UniProtKB/Swiss-Prot annotation:
Membrane topology of the entry: Lipid-anchor
Name assigned to this protein: Uncharacterized lipoprotein MG440 homolog 3
Taxonomic source organism: Mycoplasma pneumoniae (strain ATCC 29342 / M129 / Subtype 1)
UniProt superkingdom: Bacteria
Residues with a covalently attached lipid (S-diacylglycerol cysteine): 26
Length: 276
């Protein structure tokens, strides 16, 4: 009677180890083949934690994923941006350790897109430095909260991302009095020595006139994923003083609503923050 030969235990162990390695390798490359969800990317990164430690290699992997599935990869990048601001509440209560790993040292909320700071509102691009300083001196940002983040994406030539922030500020009457005429207020508008201001800020990102999102926007040298947009910022006052400032003939055309071309957003930090 013929007996089947059994593999030695050592050979079985080696076979299982080889099989496990192959499975891990497949898992690591799965998201490059057909990236369709943020959870899929998280699973791939969990299988290979070194990916997020080498940003250049990570950008290269995402570039490969984009080549295989442009729309799916772009949606994942936008979902990560939304998750970071709306779900993880990076502007309200960021995780300091994750923030440094994702955005780098020396960065702050002013480097998050969008935000309600002077930099985030592009005040330096709207006004002369002296005017921007007036606004900065009048209104001191105290709190900002992401209230909505909506994504409509069909293709790189048809998309709309809209983010609504509520910003709370404060003022000191002694500081504001020097600028009453410039900002459209009079002495009777400020009935208290100090007070709060509130506004809704709506950031709308749409298709840019040039530099549509493509493979070349995955910058492996600078370790960035540059998503170019046209940006429109609208401000809506929520209290009487803020409404009057926005209705001022001096500022109404530039402060309440303005559009900016070629506004590039590096999506890599949001992706890292959402999966770390």
């Amino acid at each position: 009677m013929n007996k089947k030969r059994l593999l030695p235990k050592a050979s079985l162990g080696a076979l299982f180890m080889l099989f496990g390695t192959a499975l891990t390798a497949c898992s690591n490359s799965d998201f490059q083949t057909n990236l369709t969800s943020l959870n899929q990317l998280r699973e791939g990164v969990n299988q290979n934690t070194s990916l997020t430690q080498d940003k250049k290699a990570f950008v290269e992997s995402l570039q490969k994923a984009f080549e295989n599935n442009p729309e799916g990869t772009t949606k994942v990048l936008l979902d990560a941006w939304k998750f970071t601001l709306l779900d993880s509440k990076i502007l309200e209560s960021k995780d300091p350790s994750r923030f440094v790993k994702a955005f780098g040292s020396g960065k702050s909320n002013e480097d998050v897109e969008p935000n309600a700071s002077v930099k985030g509102l592009r005040l330096d691009k709207r006004f002369e430095p002296s005017t921007a300083n007036i606004i900065n001196n009048v209104i001191s940002l105290n709190e900002q909260k992401v209230e909505a983040f909506n994504i409509q994406y069909k293709s790189r030539t048809s998309f709309k991302v809209q983010v609504k922030l509520n910003a709370q500020g404060k003022y000191q009457k002694s500081q504001v009095q020097s600028y009453l005429q410039q900002i459209g207020l009079n002495d009777g508008d400020l009935k208290q020595e100090s007070g709060t201001l509130s506004a809704d800020l709506i950031f709308t990102y749409t298709v840019p006139e040039s530099n549509l999102f493509s493979r070349k926007n995955f910058d492996t040298l600078m370790k960035k994923i540059n998503f170019n947009t046209t940006l429109k910022i609208d401000m809506v006052g929520k209290d009487e003083i803020m409404k009057k400032i926005l209705q001022s003939t001096t500022f109404t055309n530039n402060l309440s609503s303005q559009t900016f071309q070629d506004q590039s957003i590096d999506l890599l930090p949001y992706l890292l923050y959402s999966i770390l």
